[in-house]
């Protein structure tokens, strides 16, 4: 039984719920990548899946927009996997347990993966319908963003034609960020040594403190 079935936009929520049912933590993206490929096949869309599990899906512009400049929609397939102490979910094999309270979607005792599962859900919902006018679309879904943008770094961009990209991975709803400096991951190693220090050590404690009365 659907947990998100009463929420809008309905098709976006449908795909988000399906995505949440597939294990897709960083480094464990084969199943979610294959899910996107199956979607493309089912909807007779051209696709590319590389050895890293990145997926690109193409859709022609609808009538009247066939010759418009293509637009790229980009998101990532992996999520951050964290859970509360005592939660027995295995992120390698299990989907998430979704719940809705006061219209807010969360996952029971785990991270939700809205970053960036909602981008994938929006992309698939757009790909399945011709209800909205759009130019040719290039849907680029990369992997392992959360651990260093590894999929994006490895992606062969030569098949892509779009000069305009919308990255669906912002922090604030209703806000657009125009241009970006990108991201950098660095591993820094410094020599570390300890020396026994001379001198005396003191422990200080404060007790029986009284807060001032505010009139």
Regions flagged by a language model, labelled:
Residues 79, 170-172, 213:
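Short, glycine/acidic-enriched loop or turn micro-motifs at the edges of active sites
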Residues 65-147, 152-163:
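Active-site metal-coordination/substrate-binding segment of hydrolases
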Residues 136-206:
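Fold-level recognition of mixed alpha/beta catalytic cores in primary-metabolism enzymes, strongest
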Residues 3-103:
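Acidic/His- and Gly-rich active-site-bordering loop/insert found
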Residues 17, 21-25, 41, 45, ...:
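Generic secondary-structure signature for well-ordered alpha-helical cores
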Residues 22, 26, 106-115, 175-178, ...:
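Flexible, glycine/proline-enriched loop segments at strand-loop-helix junctions
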Residues 207-213:
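Conserved small/polar residues in nucleotide/adenosyl-binding loops
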């Amino acid at each position: 039984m659907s947990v998100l079935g009463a929420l809008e936009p309905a098709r976006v929520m449908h795909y988000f719920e399906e995505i949440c049912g597939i294990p897709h933590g960083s480094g464990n993206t084969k199943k979610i990548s294959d899910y996107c490929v199956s979607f493309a096949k089912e909807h007779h869309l051209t696709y590319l899946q590389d050895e890293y599990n990145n997926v690109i899906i193409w859709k022609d512009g609808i009538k009247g927009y066939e010759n418009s400049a293509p637009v790229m929609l980009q998101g990532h397939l992996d999520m951050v996997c964290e859970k509360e102490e005592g939660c027995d979910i295995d992120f390698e094999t299990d989907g998430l347990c979704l719940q809705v309270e006061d219209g807010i979607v969360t996952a029971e005792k785990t991270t939700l993966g809205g970053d960036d599962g909602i981008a994938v859900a929006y992309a698939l919902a757009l790909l399945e319908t011709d209800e909205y006018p759009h130019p040719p679309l290039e849907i680029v879904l990369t992997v392992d963003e959360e651990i260093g943008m590894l999929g994006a770094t490895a992606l062969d961009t030569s098949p892509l034609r779009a000069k305009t990209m919308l990255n669906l991975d912002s922090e604030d709803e209703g806000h657009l960020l125009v241009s970006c400096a990108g991201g950098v991951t660095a591993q820094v190693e410094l020599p570390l040594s300890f020396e026994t220090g001379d001198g005396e050590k003191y422990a200080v404690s404060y007790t029986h403190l009284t807060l001032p009365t505010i009139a």
